[in-house]
């Protein structure tokens, strides 16, 4: 099976990591974490079995070095679907594109924007909605 790569991109503090941590929790509930040490609510990647797929989620993605580390993790886990946060700056998106190219695929980019002047509860709902959207894409 060819690896699918999904990149959640946006500027700093727009909720990318929070969204992917919600996705990790959704996958934990609907599937099965196969990481030796689960990492809820952190930038540490985690791998799940979901609907017969191996899905790796990496909430960290602020720099090229972090995304390159995520990509090594994806390769090590031999996942069917790799999901990483990336920034719009600092080379992280380029690193994910380069990894996708090395795998012979293209990144499925999903934008994440920050809505100013929203309550924390509303921001959390927006992050949850994006996480549910990502889950449906699997």
Locate predicted features:
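Glycine-rich phosphate-binding P-loop
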Residues: 4-27
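Phosphate/oxyanion-binding active-site loops and adjacent basic polyanion-contact surfaces
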Residues: 16, 59-67, 123-130
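Short, glycine/charged-enriched secondary-structure capping and boundary segments
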Residues: 22-23, 71-72, 96-99
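Active-site catalytic pocket residues across diverse enzymes, especially alpha/beta-hydrolases
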Residues: 27, 31, 100
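Conserved nucleotide-sensing/catalytic segment adjacent to the nucleotide-binding pocket
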Residues: 32-93
